[in-house]
């Protein structure tokens, strides 16, 4: 998968059909597949209410991928298609795992005027191929316009095994709904790791049941620096944290899209959110304050403090139960 520009939509009319016009998408998507060949002169694969997305019976991951694709088709074209385990018929999109594809995240896509075959080296490969199909769809909800995929083939696999994106919620909290939108965008671009920066000097954002003050106190800062040169603050409290159930919800949401969540808890530095909540964990005993500006701060968890070492173990035990 390489990064490159996306092609333009193409439209042509079919006088004998109703709707009166067919809009064809483009297999040249972002990230750019390794190999793409399409024939825009050939009669395309036309999506209609009789289109079926076929997946192997008993394969829950491919069932979920089929359901994703059906929802994406509905979103892009307004057309409702069905998912099924029945034998493939004409006008089907057929999902399958092919062990001969050596790269587990790779896939092969073949589009004819009658059917689409999508084979992946594993379920994740099928998922990435499905995302290519999604991006290849024309955006049309006009009942007078049919949506179609051009005849062609795609052979694709990732250049990098680790494709990550980091979100820092320690300095600025984002709600669960927004994180899900980010994960959807990551899935769309074949990203497979979500790096979740959960704690910072400026705020502790994950519930730790053994240490409730981390979120009762450590998640709140009274104001935030908005102009470094003039040292202007917004005078608005900033807060927010994720319960363990919400964190598990994010982990599952990402996993359903073949994205692994990597939690980050900084220590022994970047720990003012914890020291404000539990001053006895520091080297001086405090008092400590949540920083309202950015930078490096000298106070850290005290490595020679047995309570600090136990704190680190307790926190990581709860984090590992979530992730």
Residue ranges and their predicted role:
Residues 1, 46-48, 243, 302:
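Short, solvent-exposed coil/turn linker segments
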Residues 1-26:
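Bacterial Sec-dependent N-terminal signal peptides
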Residues 9, 13-15, 50, 114, ...:
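Compositionally biased, intrinsically disordered low-complexity segments
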Residues 17-161:
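Acidic, contiguous N-terminal accessory segments
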Residues 102-299, 303-311, 315-323:
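Feature activates predominantly on carbohydrate-active enzymes
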């Amino acid at each position: 998968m390489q990064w490159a520009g996306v092609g333009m939509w193409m439209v042509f009319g079919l006088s004998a059909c109703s709707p009166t016009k067919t809009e064809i998408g483009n297999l040249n998507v972002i990230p750019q597949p390794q190999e793409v060949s399409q024939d825009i002169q050939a009669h395309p694969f036309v999506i209609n209410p009789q289109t079926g997305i076929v997946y192997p019976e008993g394969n829950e991951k491919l069932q979920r991928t089929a359901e994703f694709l059906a929802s994406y088709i509905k979103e892009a074209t307004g057309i409702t298609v069905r998912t099924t385990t029945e034998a493939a018929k004409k006008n089907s999109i057929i999902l399958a795992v092919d062990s001969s594809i050596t790269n587990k995240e790779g896939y092969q896509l073949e589009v004819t005027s009658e059917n689409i075959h999508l084979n992946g080296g594993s379920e994740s490969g099928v998922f990435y191929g499905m995302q290519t199909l999604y991006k290849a769809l024309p955006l049309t909800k006009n009942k007078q316009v049919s949506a179609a995929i051009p005849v062609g083939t795609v052979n694709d696999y990732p250049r990098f095994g680790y494709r990550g994106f980091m979100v820092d919620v320690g300095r600025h909290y984002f709600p669960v709904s927004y994180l899900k939108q980010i994960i959807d965008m990551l899935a769309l671009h074949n990203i497979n790791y979500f790096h979740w920066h959960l704690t910072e000097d400026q705020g502790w954002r994950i519930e730790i049941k053994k240490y409730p003050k981390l979120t009762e106190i450590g998640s709140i800062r009274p104001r935030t620096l908005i102009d470094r040169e003039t040292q202007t603050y917004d005078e608005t409290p900033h807060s927010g944290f994720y319960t363990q159930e919400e964190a598990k919800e994010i982990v599952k949401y990402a996993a359903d899209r073949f994205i692994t969540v990597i939690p980050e808890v900084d220590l022994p530095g970047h720990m003012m959110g914890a020291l404000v909540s539990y001053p006895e964990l520091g080297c001086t005993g405090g008092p400590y304050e949540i920083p309202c500006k950015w930078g490096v701060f000298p106070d850290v968890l005290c490595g020679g403090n047995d309570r600090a070492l136990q704190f680190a173990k307790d926190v990581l035990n709860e984090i590992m139960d979530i992730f």
